[in-house]
Amino acid sequence: VEMLDDARQRTVELTQDLPPERHLGPKLSIVNPPQWEIGHIGFFYDYFVLHKLFGLSNFQIANASQLYDSMGVAHDARWTLDLPSMEDTFDYLRIIRDAMVSRLPEGLTDSATSYVWQLATFHEDMHGEAFAYTRQTLADQMPMIVPPIGGLPCLDSGDLSGEVFVPGGEHTLGADENVGFRFDNEKPAYVRAFDSFTIDISPVTNAAFMRFVEAGGYENPNYWSNRGWVWRDTQALKAPCYWRYNDAGWQVR
């Protein structure tokens, strides 16, 4: 239940402050209308947990699948549906949450219940990421986010510079049935042969990429593919999309 409530807290925090004109927002290929996306989160629980796992014959609101099934509702159509209001959409989430919790057995659950519960909760977490990048795309100010339930661990990341050598040979990709949870695109586990390679210890940080920018990386075609350089030239870019430079130095939106 804590997993579900933590994911739900993030959904609410990332959407509750949106003004009415942003409940749908502009039609862009890389985002969903928040009012639809929140309902889709609810439908995922409604379908996989209440309907498939617990056997409820009816969804918690009428026409749920016609409105929120991402496999059946074309992306561009999501802005023109007769959607419930934002208030009613959040009520839909609350109804589903209560219905799920009331059916959760005491003590440890069986593996099927545990898997579906995790799948649906992690699905909501992924949409939390989508709400965050939608706000970034549309230049919305980020809201105040309460730390996750239980707090954040204080871990020293250590030195992030340098590379690590990965020897060639056979490596297992994906996850087998011995792990507690795996997404469908992580199975089955299979073995692949690789040549040796080196890779950075960590993903590229803003600080590291800033050195590339300040060293003239956006002015030197040697660091770009032909297609990438044409794109950079067409867009007249001097730095990444959300970077701005002023007297204080580089700032990132």
Model-derived segments and their meaning:
Residues 1-18, 22-25, 30-34, 40-42, ...:
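Extended beta-strand/loop cores of jelly-roll/beta-sandwich
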